[in-house]
Amino acid sequence: MRKKITLACKDCGSRNYTTMKSDASAAERLEVKKYCKTCNSHKTHLETK
């Protein structure tokens, strides 16, 4: 089953994106480079709980 997760900017902590993640296949937290409108540049976004 897939669950909805939120991605937060590593620098400012702003929660900018939501996405779906498979429970079974990925044990570690997701880490993606995406655009942060608060920082005004591309930053690393981490999965939040």
Swiss-Prot record:
Is Ribosomal protein among this UniProt entry's keywords? yes
SUPFAM superfamilies per the UniProt record, alphabetical = Zn-binding ribosomal proteins
* Pfam families, per database record: Ribosomal_L33
GO BP terms in the entry: translation
Instruction: Look up keyword Ribonucleoprotein and say if it applies.
Output: yes
Molecular function (GO) terms for this protein are: structural constituent of ribosome
Alphabetically sorted, this entry's keywords are: Ribonucleoprotein, Ribosomal protein
An annotated GO cellular component of this protein is:
cytoplasm
Family (UniProt): Belongs to the bacterial ribosomal protein bL33 family.
NCBIfam families referenced in this protein's UniProt entry, alphabetically: PRK00504.1, PRK00595.1, rpmG_bact
- Protein name, as recorded: Large ribosomal subunit protein bL33A
Organism of derivation: Bacillus pumilus (strain SAFR-032)
